[in-house]
A protein has these predicted regions:
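A short aromatic-anchored loop/beta-hairpin motif
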Residues: 1-115, 120-176
Protein backbone atom coordinates (compact mmCIF):
# COMPACT_ATOMS: atom_id res chain seq x y z
CA UNK A 1 0.00 0.00 0.00
CA UNK A 2 1.59 3.25 -1.10
CA UNK A 3 -0.87 5.57 0.65
CA UNK A 4 0.73 6.43 4.03
CA UNK A 5 -2.71 7.11 5.53
CA UNK A 6 -3.34 3.37 5.49
CA UNK A 7 0.08 2.13 6.60
CA UNK A 8 -0.37 -0.53 9.31
CA UNK A 9 -4.15 -0.04 9.23
CA UNK A 10 -6.72 -2.60 10.25
CA UNK A 11 -9.94 -1.79 8.39
CA UNK A 12 -13.30 -3.34 9.11
CA UNK A 13 -15.34 -3.55 5.90
CA UNK A 14 -18.88 -2.47 6.79
CA UNK A 15 -20.46 -2.77 3.36
CA UNK A 16 -19.40 -4.17 0.02
CA UNK A 17 -21.32 -4.34 -3.24
CA UNK A 18 -20.78 -4.10 -6.98
CA UNK A 19 -20.84 -0.31 -6.55
CA UNK A 20 -17.95 -0.20 -4.07
CA UNK A 21 -17.02 -0.69 -0.44
CA UNK A 22 -17.03 1.23 2.81
CA UNK A 23 -14.96 0.48 5.90
CA UNK A 24 -13.61 1.93 9.12
CA UNK A 25 -10.01 1.98 10.31
CA UNK A 26 -10.23 0.41 13.76
CA UNK A 27 -6.66 0.84 15.02
CA UNK A 28 -5.94 4.56 14.62
CA UNK A 29 -6.85 6.85 17.52
CA UNK A 30 -8.32 10.27 16.90
CA UNK A 31 -6.08 12.58 18.91
CA UNK A 32 -7.61 15.97 18.10
CA UNK A 33 -10.94 15.63 19.94
CA UNK A 34 -12.23 13.85 23.03
CA UNK A 35 -15.67 12.27 23.34
CA UNK A 36 -17.10 14.96 25.69
CA UNK A 37 -15.94 17.67 23.24
CA UNK A 38 -17.63 15.83 20.38
CA UNK A 39 -20.86 15.67 22.38
CA UNK A 40 -20.60 19.41 23.07
CA UNK A 41 -19.99 20.21 19.39
CA UNK A 42 -23.03 18.18 18.41
CA UNK A 43 -25.17 19.76 21.17
CA UNK A 44 -25.82 16.38 22.74
CA UNK A 45 -26.88 16.87 26.35
CA UNK A 46 -25.13 14.45 28.64
CA UNK A 47 -25.60 16.39 31.87
CA UNK A 48 -28.10 13.90 33.26
CA UNK A 49 -26.28 10.80 32.23
CA UNK A 50 -25.41 7.89 34.44
CA UNK A 51 -21.87 7.73 33.10
CA UNK A 52 -19.52 10.06 35.02
CA UNK A 53 -17.86 12.73 32.87
CA UNK A 54 -14.43 11.36 33.81
CA UNK A 55 -15.42 8.02 32.24
CA UNK A 56 -16.69 9.76 29.10
CA UNK A 57 -13.19 11.19 28.62
CA UNK A 58 -11.89 7.62 28.45
CA UNK A 59 -14.06 6.75 25.45
CA UNK A 60 -11.60 6.55 22.57
CA UNK A 61 -12.49 8.08 19.23
CA UNK A 62 -10.95 6.61 16.08
CA UNK A 63 -9.95 8.01 12.71
CA UNK A 64 -12.18 5.87 10.52
CA UNK A 65 -10.63 7.05 7.29
CA UNK A 66 -9.99 10.08 5.11
CA UNK A 67 -13.50 10.40 3.65
CA UNK A 68 -16.06 12.71 5.32
CA UNK A 69 -14.02 13.12 8.50
CA UNK A 70 -16.76 15.30 9.98
CA UNK A 71 -19.19 12.37 10.06
CA UNK A 72 -19.37 9.86 12.86
CA UNK A 73 -19.86 6.13 12.48
CA UNK A 74 -20.40 3.76 15.39
CA UNK A 75 -19.44 0.14 14.86
CA UNK A 76 -21.10 -1.74 17.70
CA UNK A 77 -22.35 -5.00 19.10
CA UNK A 78 -25.62 -6.24 17.65
CA UNK A 79 -27.42 -5.99 21.01
CA UNK A 80 -28.35 -2.42 20.05
CA UNK A 81 -30.28 -1.42 16.95
CA UNK A 82 -32.21 1.54 15.61
CA UNK A 83 -34.30 1.76 12.47
CA UNK A 84 -31.27 3.00 10.52
CA UNK A 85 -28.80 0.46 11.93
CA UNK A 86 -26.98 -1.66 9.36
CA UNK A 87 -26.71 -5.22 10.65
CA UNK A 88 -23.35 -6.49 9.39
CA UNK A 89 -23.19 -9.88 11.10
CA UNK A 90 -24.75 -11.74 14.01
CA UNK A 91 -22.47 -9.84 16.39
CA UNK A 92 -21.61 -6.53 14.67
CA UNK A 93 -23.72 -3.60 13.47
CA UNK A 94 -23.18 -0.03 12.27
CA UNK A 95 -25.16 3.07 13.22
CA UNK A 96 -24.47 6.67 12.24
CA UNK A 97 -26.96 8.77 14.20
CA UNK A 98 -26.79 11.29 17.02
CA UNK A 99 -29.16 9.10 19.04
CA UNK A 100 -26.58 6.35 19.48
CA UNK A 101 -23.98 8.87 20.71
CA UNK A 102 -26.51 10.15 23.23
CA UNK A 103 -27.32 6.59 24.29
CA UNK A 104 -23.62 5.82 24.77
CA UNK A 105 -23.13 9.00 26.81
CA UNK A 106 -26.09 8.03 29.01
CA UNK A 107 -24.91 4.46 29.49
CA UNK A 108 -27.85 3.10 27.45
CA UNK A 109 -26.03 2.28 24.23
CA UNK A 110 -24.63 -0.98 22.91
CA UNK A 111 -22.52 -3.18 25.15
CA UNK A 112 -19.50 -2.78 22.85
CA UNK A 113 -18.79 0.03 20.41
CA UNK A 114 -16.10 1.77 18.42
CA UNK A 115 -16.68 5.42 17.48
CA UNK A 116 -15.00 6.53 14.26
CA UNK A 117 -14.82 9.91 12.56
CA UNK A 118 -14.68 9.55 8.79
CA UNK A 119 -14.56 6.39 6.75
CA UNK A 120 -12.55 4.61 4.10
CA UNK A 121 -14.20 4.17 0.73
CA UNK A 122 -13.52 2.37 -2.53
CA UNK A 123 -15.21 2.76 -5.90
CA UNK A 124 -16.47 -0.02 -8.15
CA UNK A 125 -13.83 -2.78 -8.30
CA UNK A 126 -11.18 -0.70 -6.54
CA UNK A 127 -10.94 -2.78 -3.35
CA UNK A 128 -10.92 -6.03 -5.32
CA UNK A 129 -8.06 -4.73 -7.47
CA UNK A 130 -6.10 -3.68 -4.39
CA UNK A 131 -6.57 -7.14 -2.86
CA UNK A 132 -5.40 -8.83 -6.08
CA UNK A 133 -2.30 -6.59 -6.00
CA UNK A 134 -1.65 -7.79 -2.42
CA UNK A 135 -2.25 -4.33 -0.97
CA UNK A 136 -4.51 -5.85 1.69
CA UNK A 137 -4.60 -9.05 3.70
CA UNK A 138 -8.10 -10.21 4.64
CA UNK A 139 -9.56 -12.05 7.62
CA UNK A 140 -13.11 -12.90 8.69
CA UNK A 141 -14.98 -10.31 10.75
CA UNK A 142 -14.12 -10.77 14.42
CA UNK A 143 -16.00 -8.93 17.18
CA UNK A 144 -13.27 -9.81 19.68
CA UNK A 145 -10.65 -8.08 17.52
CA UNK A 146 -12.87 -5.05 16.86
CA UNK A 147 -14.17 -4.39 20.36
CA UNK A 148 -12.05 -6.19 22.95
CA UNK A 149 -8.49 -5.96 21.62
CA UNK A 150 -6.30 -3.04 22.69
CA UNK A 151 -5.71 -0.53 19.93
CA UNK A 152 -1.97 -1.16 19.69
CA UNK A 153 -2.48 -4.95 19.47
CA UNK A 154 -5.10 -5.08 16.71
CA UNK A 155 -2.63 -5.28 13.82
CA UNK A 156 -0.54 -8.06 15.35
CA UNK A 157 -3.69 -9.99 16.35
CA UNK A 158 -5.03 -9.67 12.80
CA UNK A 159 -1.72 -11.00 11.46
CA UNK A 160 -1.79 -13.82 14.01
CA UNK A 161 -5.25 -14.88 12.78
CA UNK A 162 -3.61 -15.42 9.39
CA UNK A 163 -0.66 -17.24 10.93
CA UNK A 164 1.68 -14.45 9.84
CA UNK A 165 4.72 -13.27 11.77
CA UNK A 166 4.67 -9.51 11.18
CA UNK A 167 8.46 -9.24 11.37
CA UNK A 168 8.72 -11.59 8.39
CA UNK A 169 6.53 -9.43 6.11
CA UNK A 170 8.04 -7.52 3.21
CA UNK A 171 6.63 -4.45 1.54
CA UNK A 172 7.44 -6.09 -1.82
CA UNK A 173 4.78 -8.51 -3.06
CA UNK A 174 4.12 -10.35 -6.27
CA UNK A 175 2.16 -13.16 -7.84
CA UNK A 176 3.56 -16.40 -9.19
Amino acid sequence: MTDPRFENSVIFICSHSAEGAMGLVINTPCENIAFPELLDQLNIDYGHNITPKAQLKNIQLHEGGPVETGRGFILHSADYAQETTLIISETIALTATLDILSAIACGKGPLYYLIALGFSGWGRGQLENEIVRNSWLTIEADAELVFKTDLELKLSRAHAKLGINFSMLSSQFGNA
